[in-house]
UniProtKB/Swiss-Prot annotation:
Cross-referenced Gene3D superfamilies: 3.30.230.10, GHMP kinase, C-terminal domain
Organism phylogeny: Bacteria, Bacillati, Cyanobacteriota, Cyanophyceae, Oscillatoriophycideae
Catalytic activity: 4-CDP-2-C-methyl-D-erythritol + ATP = 4-CDP-2-C-methyl-D-erythritol 2-phosphate + ADP + H(+)
Catalytic machinery residues: 11, 141
Family matches, as SUPFAM superfamilies: GHMP Kinase, C-terminal domain, Ribosomal protein S5 domain 2-like
Record-given protein name: 4-diphosphocytidyl-2-C-methyl-D-erythritol kinase
One of the protein's GO biological processes: terpenoid biosynthetic process
Any Pfam family matching the protein: GHMP_kinases_C
Gene Ontology MF: a single term: 4-(cytidine 5'-diphospho)-2-C-methyl-D-erythritol kinase activity
């Protein structure tokens, strides 16, 4: 049996609007999700035994059942017990390049990669929609990570409508290593502060979703108009995260003054990004940020927007 190494890209949010509560306890969301080429490498190697083993040298990445990559493997075992009996388990090695606890879907994309890899190793022949159906059982971001590119995500984030790929722009990403924002905390706090704005009527939710589909940001994406996209970036979670984390708020303010098309926090944070027209501009802004904030706790990356989801890098 072949071993596979898969490229697992991270993602940013270009748009995140919280519409209301769902009966399942999650929030009703409208998001525009975008893959970036800052990616982990996930290697799946058949191990000849009836178990999964997970390896990662990054000290902040768990290697037990709390890791989404491990949970993805166990889900495949539960769904396809005959194939697990026939082919056995795999050793999963994560080469972690996406920052941890950053709002960039690093855990979700690792889980998506394991689904894709086991589909190949176990010769299941699952289609992308079938893989995304399994992915939705693992987490809201995992279905998007399977397909990648640019997409509108609704429901709790698992209902995807792919749109014209946006791969002509770059981003500077910045994150304080010591700061981690709890996603459940961010949504819970938003509910406490802003539930008077929530919509519960299904028709009104659908109407709001349609407004975003037909709205100016979608038009800017279709036209690949970076300047307009930058002006229309939106994230409701900034309303609760930035007041609670002044370092992140200061970082966002600093980056917004450096040029580029627009600056925003991604997801529940704490990563902040600036949209750029070129690699050269992104590198220049990265250098300016470093000159203005000398804190060694601050990490910076440059990445290109990507039209790719999980990809096989090596089979052998």
């Amino acid at each position: 049996m072949h071993a596979y190494t898969l490229i697992a890209p991270g993602k940013i949010n270009l748009y995140l609007e919280i519409i209301g509560d769902r009966p399942d306890g999650y929030h009703e969301l409208i998001m525009i999700l975008q893959s970036i080429d800052l990616a982990d490498r996930i290697t799946l190697r058949p191990n000849g035994v009836q178990q999964f083993r997970l390896y990662c040298s990054h000290p902040q990445v768990p290697t037990d059942e709390s890791n989404l990559a491990y949970r993805a493997a166990k889900l495949m075992q539960q769904e396809f017990p005959k194939q697990f009996d026939n082919f056995g388990g795999v050793d999963i090695t994560i080469d972690k390049r996406i920052p941890v606890a950053a709002g960039l879907a690093g855990g979700s994309t690792n889980g998506a990669a394991v689904l894709v890899g086991l589909n190949l190793i176990w010769q299941l022949g699952l289609t992308q929609p079938e893989l995304q159906g399994l992915a939705s059982l693992l987490g809201s971001d995992v279905p998007f990570c399977v397909s990648g590119g640019t997409a509108i995500a609704t429901g709790r984030g698992e209902q995807l409508d792919p749109i014209y790929d946006l791969d002509n722009l770059w981003v500077v990403l910045a994150k304080y290593t010591s700061i981690a924002v709890s996603t459940p905390w961010a949504y819970k706090t938003y509910r406490q502060l802003f539930n008077n704005t929530y919509i519960s009527d299904r028709e009104r939710i659908q109407a709001r979703t349609h407004q975003v589909h037909a709205g100016p940001l979608m038009g800017a994406i279709l036209q690949k108009d970076g300047a307009k996209i930058g002006r229309l970036l939106h994230n409701d979670l900034e309303k609760v995260v930035l007041p609670e984390y002044p370092q992140v708020a200061h970082l966002r303010e600093t980056m917004a003054k450096m040029g580029g098309f627009g600056t925003m926090m991604s997801g529940s944070g704490p990563t902040v990004f600036t949209l750029c027209e070129s690699y050269a501009q992104a590198e220049k802004i990265k250098q300016h940020i470093r000159e203005n904030i000398s804190d060694i706790d601050l990490q910076l990356w440059v990445a290109q927007l990507s039209n790719m989801g999980i990809q096989v890098e090596i089979a052998g």
